[in-house]
Amino acid sequence: MQLNSTEISELIKKRIAQFDVVSEAQSTGTIVSVSDGIIRIHGLADVMQGEMIELPGNRYAIALNLERDSVGAVVMGPYADLAEGMSVKCTGRILEVPVGRGLLGRVVNTLGQPIDGKGEIDNDGFSPVEVIAPGVIDRQSVDQPVQTGYKAVDSMVPIGRGQRELIIGDRQTGKTALAIDAIIAQKDSGIKCIYVAIGQKASTIANVVRKLEEHGALANTIVVVASASESAALQYLAPYSGCAMGEYFRDRGEDALIVYDDLSKQAVAYRQISLLLRRPPGREAFPGDVFYLHSRLLERAARVSADYVERFTNGAVKGQTGSLTALPIIETQAGDVSAFVPTNVISITDGQIFLESSLFNSGIRPAVNPGISVSRVGSAAQTKAIKKLSGGIRTALAQYRELAAFAQFASDLDDATRKQLSHGQKVTELLKQKQFAPMPVSEQALVLFAAEFGYLDDVELERIGSFESALLAYANSNHTDFMKNLAKSGDYNDSIKDQLKAIVEDFKKNGAW
């Protein structure tokens, strides 16, 4: 059969008309080496810093090193079956995690996937893990308190909503206990909590989750887990994931509290990644940008203005400020706060609570050292009652420490010095507190009132603990309404002062401790 030229051209035109062109531009590359969770990829000319790269087996890597001939990426998950020659492709997206109220009460991994066996999470959307912190104009000064429930902290190193307060100390000095109690204290305050566990044993994390559940605080908390068995990449990214989940509440005019436990382990994970990527090491073998690692994370904790919230929610929320308060934890070696990472984080944060192993071992718990613990912005956020009644506490402790050191060398002391030493010992005893027993403002105010106005002077040192518990039991049973109102308002005036005085004096007359 012969076709003439007209038929051939018609046939070609028909075929061209029927041809459906579906073109999809893809930037692909080839793995050239795999080692210790780091892959080097040839190709991927259009890849961006921090972009997710799709690997075989529904896994992802994050591009961290963009070099002339190759891309260095860190694998998120298992990498043992990856091999040279495998094909990978760009996604055009940066890492995002699920956010929303559906995460409250759940335990998730760095990627926001549930690991508590309670089924899928009903999230409100996704948010990038790396976000630029709010600017200066979008921020507002810190003037509302976050009550930790610890007398020693709320009176001497108060924390405000939107503040960054570092908890620093050697291992086994009660850093995690302090942070967990601060979360438990928020169960009725309306502050949402996020606990980020980095590089800890799975058994330790399970214990923390159980304690939060026992004390009714888990329903108000998101637990983000990157345990010691996870890859360095997931440990490095966990704080950013938790922060994105906290920002969801901050940007909608609510208050949130996030605990990073602890950033020393995140810095070690980042050092491991950087050295494997062949980045030049600096002091203590950390990379040059380890300061930026923590500063870009902690600057996202802020109190944002009502205008920012209104703009973010497109007018749905008006006249409400939002806040994200951060409690980063840093572990020191033999009390050395001048090491690289501790000094970095101290300079970024708005104050630090320094926990001392010598105090902890001598039975003073929480082991807060009032001499070098400081809150740079929190005093503006203190409740009136605590502010008025805690003024003499720090002074009494400072004088006591000075005199105690001096008294070791002096054989005979005058009455005034003896009185100051005795008062300091009693205040130290009074500030001791058991774990999982946060105190409301009203109870703290009553106890501080008794210390401030000399009602402890005739109480024996070993009876201080029983005096305190009996006084609180008496006040809560006989003056219930007053204690409830004081816990709500945190106010202080002549009327409240007279009422506190009457409670303590009536109780002392009773003498039932």
Swiss-Prot record:
Organism encoding this protein: Actinobacillus pleuropneumoniae serotype 5b (strain L20)
Family, as annotated: Belongs to the ATPase alpha/beta chains family.
Swiss-Prot/TrEMBL site (Required for activity) positions: S373
Alphabetical list of SUPFAM superfamilies matching this protein: C-terminal domain of alpha and beta subunits of F1 ATP synthase, N-terminal domain of alpha and beta subunits of F1 ATP synthase, P-loop containing nucleoside triphosphate hydrolases
Keyword flag Nucleus: no
Entry-linked InterPro entries: ATP_synth_asu-like_sf, ATP_synth_asu_C, ATP_synth_asu_C_sf, ATP_synth_F1_a_nt-bd_dom, ATP_synth_F1_asu, ATPase_a/bsu_AS, ATPase_F1/V1/A1_a/bsu_N, ATPase_F1/V1/A1_a/bsu_N_sf
HAMAP family: ATP_synth_alpha_bact
Reactions that this protein is recorded to catalyse: ATP + H2O + 4 H(+)(in) = ADP + phosphate + 5 H(+)(out)
Subunit and interaction comment: F-type ATPases have 2 components, CF(1) - the catalytic core - and CF(0) - the membrane proton channel. CF(1) has five subunits: alpha(3), beta(3), gamma(1), delta(1), epsilon(1). CF(0) has three main subunits: a(1), b(2) and c(9-12). The alpha and beta chains form an alternating ring which encloses part of the gamma chain. CF(1) is attached to CF(0) by a central stalk formed by the gamma and epsilon chains, while a peripheral stalk is formed by the delta and b chains.
Membrane topology according to the record: Peripheral membrane protein
Pfam families named in the record: ATP-synt_ab, ATP-synt_ab_C, ATP-synt_ab_N
GO MF annotations in UniProt: ADP binding; ATP binding; proton-transporting ATP synthase activity, rotational mechanism
PANTHER family linked to this entry: ATP SYNTHASE SUBUNIT ALPHA, MITOCHONDRIAL
GO cellular component terms, A-Z: plasma membrane; proton-transporting ATP synthase complex
Record-listed E.C. numbers: 7.1.2.2
Keywords assigned by UniProt, alphabetized: ATP synthesis, ATP-binding, Cell inner membrane, Cell membrane, CF(1), Hydrogen ion transport, Ion transport, Membrane, Nucleotide-binding, Translocase, Transport
Function summary: Produces ATP from ADP in the presence of a proton gradient across the membrane. The alpha chain is a regulatory subunit.
CDD domains membership: ATP-synt_F1_alpha_C, ATP-synt_F1_alpha_N, F1-ATPase_alpha_CD
Catalytic class of the enzyme: translocase
Sequence positions that bind ATP: G169, D170, R171, Q172, T173, G174, K175, T176
Gene it is expressed from: atpA
Gene3D superfamilies: 2.40.30.20, ATP synthase alpha/beta chain, C-terminal domain (1.20.150.20), P-loop containing nucleotide triphosphate hydrolases (3.40.50.300)
Protein name per its UniProtKB record: ATP synthase subunit alpha
Subcellular location(s) of the protein: Cell inner membrane
